[in-house]
Amino acid sequence: MTMLNPKKQISKPNTLIPNEHGFYGIYGGVFVPKELIVPLAEIADCFNNTAFTKEFQDELFYYYKNYVGRPSPLYYAANISCGGAKIYLKREDLNHTGAHKINHCIGEVLLAKKMGKKRVIAETGAGQHGIAIATAAALLGIECVIYMGEQDVKKEYPNVLKIKTLGAKVVCVGSGAKGLKEAVDAAFDDYLKDPETQMYAIGSVVGPHPFPLMVASFQSIVGKEAREQFLEQEGRLPDNVVACVGGGSNSMGIFSGFFADKTVKLTGVEPAGKGLETGLHAAPLAKGRVGVVHGFKCYFMQDDKGNPMGTHSVASGLDYLGVGPQHCYLKDSGRVTYRSACDDEAVDAFFMLSRKEGIIPALESAHAVAYALKLSKELGKDKSILVNLSGRGEKDLDYVLSLYGKKYGVDI
């Protein structure tokens, strides 16, 4: 495994770089069957030697600008800021496909093509990564297979239809808890069968090296843009940057723009589900222990014997038992503070943003909005908060309204 080669780079990403073995402190690494060691090393070499050449970057940024619609806007949400700190939203929900996921998906599929792969495979929870990979695969002319837990297929069925419409195959995973963990398990099993002709295009800053580095690097465009936009609009940096954390790709993306700015507080918001005290949550940084899962070392939800535990979140995209190694390192170092928001808080923020600003957020993003609303009241009018609005919420409407519609006055 090699690190980024600075001689080849034309635009070094402002993100955490692991050591030569893929570790961020004690987290990360490569814990996989021996059959995957060489294929993963080949992906790392291709990324290190190709992804930051002028040719690759020109193609990537052509698609970012003309296909994705970057830069995404920075919006001052005055109506929800009333009486507290100014809340700004980085509008990743306005990207093509409706979320931040397209940023790394185009990069991953471009790499797969450079390596001569015939197919990309991926897992998805809420469906946003599945849509983004299927979109990039259609754009670049490569076969695509998406693994999705049966529970999430039912919950996010509009996204399943979109994935199929884009020409990708959806494999419904019915084992275990039928969620994101099982989808990842199935995707890894498929990748293990044929790593020569296909590439696993992982959906977050998780998995064995080089996946966490790759995804974080492609997502760093979010933080770079947000920093420049905030300085332009406010003439200074934000006091706080807030983002939801499941695997952790959107938060790594926006945090990366501010790592060097010690006056800027960074806060990741995990899903507290029914409450951290209930065990029905997906908050490994708050309640997990260090171990190895899905090929890398991280905090993850496990029992006293080290076996993976079930998780719960109203947001499928956050319902994962582990978290990216960069986040584990940032938690231990203290550079990022991690908090949580429960299901009810996220749903309340979902409706508040919809009704106060006319923006329907993804349930995942609503966790960050929920925490920002509380923080805004604590800080006061002279402070500012930047929130990464990582996705839009049309995908969640059927599910949210079926469970919470009556409470919020919506008849269905």
Curated annotation (Swiss-Prot):
EC number from the UniProt entry: 4.2.1.20
Cofactors named for this entry: pyridoxal 5'-phosphate
Keywords: Amino-acid biosynthesis, Aromatic amino acid biosynthesis, Lyase, Pyridoxal phosphate, Tryptophan biosynthesis
The keyword Lyase appears for this protein: yes
Record field: catalytic activity: (1S,2R)-1-C-(indol-3-yl)glycerol 3-phosphate + L-serine = D-glyceraldehyde 3-phosphate + L-tryptophan + H2O
Annotated positions of the N6-(pyridoxal phosphate)lysine modification: K101
Full protein name: Tryptophan synthase beta chain
